[in-house]
Regions:
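Amphipathic alpha-helical packing elements
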Residues: 2-31, 36, 337-338, 346-347
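Eukaryotic acidic, Ser/Thr-rich intrinsically disordered low-complexity regions
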Residues: 2-5, 126-156
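Conserved phosphate/anionic-ligand binding catalytic regions in large, soluble enzymes, centered on
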Residues: 177-183, 239-252, 333, 337-348
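Structural detector for internal amphipathic alpha-helices that build alpha-solenoid repeat scaffolds
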Residues: 15-20, 42-59, 73, 80-95, ...
Length: 362
C-alpha cells in the first residue's frame, strides 16, 4: 500500500498538486498497517490517518471511524493510536460516523470526559441530539454539560471573530469573471478533484494574466508570486461570479486563496472576495464557504498592492492609510458566518443551540 501510495504522490507532484484523499480501499489497507506498522513508518501512517481521509459520511470516513471505534472498544489495537488519541481523532471528523461512538463513550469511566470535550465542538449531530438528551435525562452529568455547552454556543464563541483590521495583498482580475473562467465547462471531468481542476482557472488569455499554458493551465506563476508575499490574498474583480457553476468556481478560488481546513484534505474555506459587483448565487456560495465576501468599488485597487481592510468601518486603505474604497456589508450576519467557518455551519449550529436551550440543564 505504501509503495503504491508513494508512487501516486510522485505522479501528483509532477502535476503540481497534492495526492488525492484516501479512498475506502486505501483506508482499509492503512488500518491494517496501523495495527502492525513497518518500522520507521509510524509518523507517516499517523499523518495519513489524521489528515488524508475525508471526514463526514464518505466511505473512507466509515472505515476510519470503524477502526477508531474498535480501538476504544478494545476490539483492535495499535502501537501508534492509543484510546485517548482515537477519541481525539474521532472528534476531528466533524460529524457522521464518529458521533455514535463518542456518545457511547459518555458512559466510559476513562474516556467519557475526553469524548464530551469533542462532542461540545461538533454541531453536525442531527438526530443523535436525542441520544445525548436521553443520557442527560438519565443523570449523565457530561451529557448535561454538552447540551449546556451547545446552549451557550461555545462551538461558535471559541472561534476567532473577524478582525477589525485585515492586511492583505491583492490578486485582481479586471473586467467580468464568469464561473466558466474559474471552473471551465470543458474541464468539468476534474471538478471533484479540486486541486487539479483549479489549475484550469483563468486558463484563457486576458488582460493582466499570463496563463502557464494558454487554453489548458492558468496563471500559476502569478498566483504563486502573490501567495509568496506571505499575506492573506484578497481576490478582487470588477464583476465576479456570473454563471451557474458557482460551487466548483468557489472551490477553485479558495484552493488558491482560502485557508486549509484541519482534517479535510484538498479543500479550503475562508478567504477574502471583493467585487464591484458579485453575482448573487456566487456571493451566497462564498458565504457558505466562510469567505469574507462583499461588494466595494475596486477601481483604485490593483494586483500586488498591499491593502488594509476595515470590515466593521466599511473602508479599504493602502498601507499609508489613504482610503481606496468605502463599502457597506450586505448584512452584519456575514461576520458570524465567517466566524462559524461558513453560512451552512452557522445555520446548523444556531439550530443546535436553539434546541439545546429548550432543554438546557442548569
Amino acid at each position: 500500500m505504501l509503495e503504491a501510495y508513494r508512487s501516486h504522490v510522485a505522479e501528483r507532484e509532477e502535476l503540481g498538486v497534492p495526492p488525492k484523499p484516501l479512498d475506502a480501499a486505501w483506508t482499509s489497507e492503512l488500518v491494517e498497517l496501523l495495527q502492525d506498522p513497518p518500522k520507521g513508518e509510524e509518523d507517516f501512517l499517523l499523518d495519513l490517518l489524521t489528515n488524508r481521509i475525508p471526514p463526514g459520511v464518505d466511505e473512507a470516513a466509515y472505515v476510519k471511524a470503524g477502526f477508531l471505534s474498535a480501538i476504544v472498544k478494545d476490539e483492535a489495537s495499535s502501537p501508534i493510536v492509543d484510546k485517548p488519541l482515537a477519541v481525539e481523532l474521532l472528534g476531528n471528523m466533524l460529524g457522521g460516523y464518529n458521533v455514535s461512538t463518542l456518545i457511547d463513550l459518555l458512559d466510559d469511566q476513562d474516556l467519557a470526559e475526553k469524548a464530551a470535550d469533542q462532542l461540545k465542538n461538533i454541531t453536525l449531530v442531527f438526530d443523535a441530539f436525542y441520544d445525548i438528551s436521553a443520557k442527560a435525562d438519565q443523570g449523565n452529568s457530561l451529557a448535561k454539560a454538552i447540551i449546556q455547552s451547545w446552549a451557550d454556543a461555545e462551538w461558535f464563541n471559541s472561534k476567532d471573530p473577524v478582525a477589525s483590521e485585515i492586511k492583505a495583498v491583492v490578486f485582481k482580475v479586471s473586467g467580468e469573471t464568469n464561473t466558466d473562467d474559474l471552473s471551465p465547462a470543458q474541464d468539468a471531468w476534474s471538478r471533484p478533484d479540486i486541486p487539479l481542476h483549479a489549475k484550469a482557472m483563468y486558463k484563457m488569455q486576458r488582460e493582466g494574466l499570463q496563463p502557464e499554458e494558454p487554453g489548458a493551465i492558468g496563471p500559476m506563476g502569478q498566483i504563486k508570486a502573490i501567495k509568496e508575499r506571505g499575506l492573506p490574498v484578497a481576490y478582487v474583480g470588477d464583476v465576479v461570479g456570473t454563471g451557474s457553476s458557482r460551487k466548483s468556481a468557489t472551490n477553485s478560488v479558495l484552493w488558491f486563496f482560502g485557508d486549509e481546513i484541519d482534517g479535510v484534505p484538498n479543500k479550503n474555506s475562508g478567504g477574502i472576495c471583493i467585487g464591484n459587483k458579485i453575482a448573487p448565487i456566487f456571493f451566497n456560495t462564498m458565504e457558505d464557504a466562510g469567505a469574507l465576501v462583499f461588494e466595494a468599488p475596486v477601481e483604485k485597487i490593483n494586483t500586488g498592492q498591499v491593502i488594509k481592510i476595515f470590515p466593521y468601518e466599511g473602508k479599504i486603505t493602502d498601507e499609508s492609510g489613504e482610503i481606496l474604497s468605502e463599502f457597506e456589508m450586505k448584512s452584519d450576519v456575514i461576520f458570524d458566518e465567517v466566524q462559524a467557518d461558513g453560512r451552512i455551519n452557522l445555520i446548523i449550529g444556531r439550530s443546535l443551540t436553539q434546541r439545546s436551550r429548550a432543554v438546557s440543564y442548569t
